[in-house]
Amino acid sequence: MSSPFSVPSLIMEEEGRFEAEVAEVEAWWGTDRFRLTKRPYTARDVALLRGTLRQSYASGDMAKKLWRTLRAHQANGTASRTFGALDPVQVAMMAKHLDTVYVSGWQCSSTHTSTNEPGPDLADYPYDTVPNKVEHLFFAQLYHDRKQREARMSMSRAERAHEPYVDYLKPIIADGDTGFGGATATVKLCKLFVERGAAGVHLEDQSSVTKKCGHMAGKVLVAVSEHVNRLVAARLQFDIMGVETVLVARTDAVAATLIQTNVDARDHQFILGATNPRLRNRSLAAVLSDAMSAGKNGRELQAIEDEWLATAQLKTFSDCVRDAIASLNATDADKQRKLQEWSAATSHDKCVPLEQARDIAAGLGVTSLFWDWDLPRTREGFYRFRGSVAAAVVRGRAFAPHADVLWMETSSPNIAECTAFAEGVRAASPGAMLAYNLSPSFNWDASGMTDADMSEFIPRVARLGYVWQFITLAGFHADALVTDTFARDFARRGMLAYVERIQREERSNGVETLQHQKWSGANFYDRVLKTVQGGISSTAAMGKGVTEEQFKGSWTGPGSESSSHVLAKSRM
């Protein structure tokens, strides 16, 4: 007879540590930070996926700071306003005036990919492109923070009292595009973002294969359930790493015209179908295939597709039923009653599946209705989709339990759309925080707004709950504008153009890059050298002979100001 198994003490200790970690994760999830967060997995699942060596991440601290910032804005009815930072100079300048930083995939795609190959925003660059830019900017933030500390702690208390402190460590929110593939790709992307310094990440509900800039045509959505899986994958990775990275869920449902699949019932009400029975058994894909076999191409194929779509009379199933009710042989009062019953039974928030909708229609006397969502599918197999704010609301409600902030991409700065989305989402998720893209793709001057309207736009939208508002590409446009106008003037007027447009403007506005050696940290590394060499260095960069001494005096030329006045401005 075998003796009973004795569990070694090391095994018991291992299990004890594991169970303690499970309890720790459960307690963490029970904090106010995750009060609104839903997870389809357990704390034990997270602990099983962690290693034994606990790591900490600077981005974790920045994520907590970002969360506090956004919640404060939510409580105050205000918004964090920011824009896409292009480089370390911009991120350092932004720190003086803004409380968050954005890193745009569009800007990275056009200016800073991992392969150095520029292009439009199709998310076809290597997936470490945006994380690399995050690290580029985060390292700059850390450096300027160190540099400032050395400078301030080398001053007297009286000097520090007159020198404004700049918080260079502003939380970075980064563009995660569509997650760059399946769940494992999203997990690895989010891990990179945490390691590189991102405090927040946004993921959008477009197909990763056909991803487009939110202001381009041809956008293809994934099913609601697929994007929920992306958000869950991101949250799981953040949980594994023990960070509170802010997760932003973006939907492109307002302007999307296609969707990958009809598998999710929440999408059914927005999918378009052919209503012309003459096209029965003549799908668009088959017609185009036959035309290509006959040698048609280019404009001829486009003309064939346009004609087919016009003949098909595409409608949502709900619109098709409404038209059928209007055509019934019944009194106007009876028709109105049936329309009201249909609207009540199939409202957007109910997300009624197609088969159930057919049963409801039949109960109202609408039978033998021809409506086919497969006939108009594209050659790639995509379904036709009617984008709308209502579709965005349905998706926002589905994403809310899995994300911290919700973002509806729009095609214009439309207060009515902002209001409808905010009210629709917050009816189901009252505590939801919202984001808004103050896009440079909008022609703001053609929006019908006055200058006063534009000035008030951010505060007005903030009062609706949009706590984070950002101009995605302002860094790009500012860089282009300054460079183009200066280059043109420099070609014409030479050094006077530089002095007037750059040097004097830096001086009069107190921009510290006027003394670029100091700004870049020459004094900081002189301190390093002197520390290494016992307090002295004959090769100090800012020693006797440095040309920046010229900027410490007074100027009497045109456009000049005294150094004391410049210093005062720099401290404002």
Curated annotation (Swiss-Prot):
Involved in storage lipid mobilization during the growth of higher plant seedling. Expressed in leaves. Keywords: Glyoxylate bypass, Glyoxysome, Lyase, Magnesium, Metal-binding, Peroxisome, Tricarboxylic acid cycle. Residues 550-572 are annotated as: Disordered. Induction: By submergence in seedlings. By dark-induced senescence in leaves. Gene3D superfamilies: 1.10.10.850, Phosphoenolpyruvate-binding domains. It comes from the Eukaryota. It comes from Oryza sativa subsp. japonica (Rice). The gene is ICL. It is found in: Glyoxysome. This is Isocitrate lyase. Its EC number is 4.1.3.1. The keyword Magnesium applies.
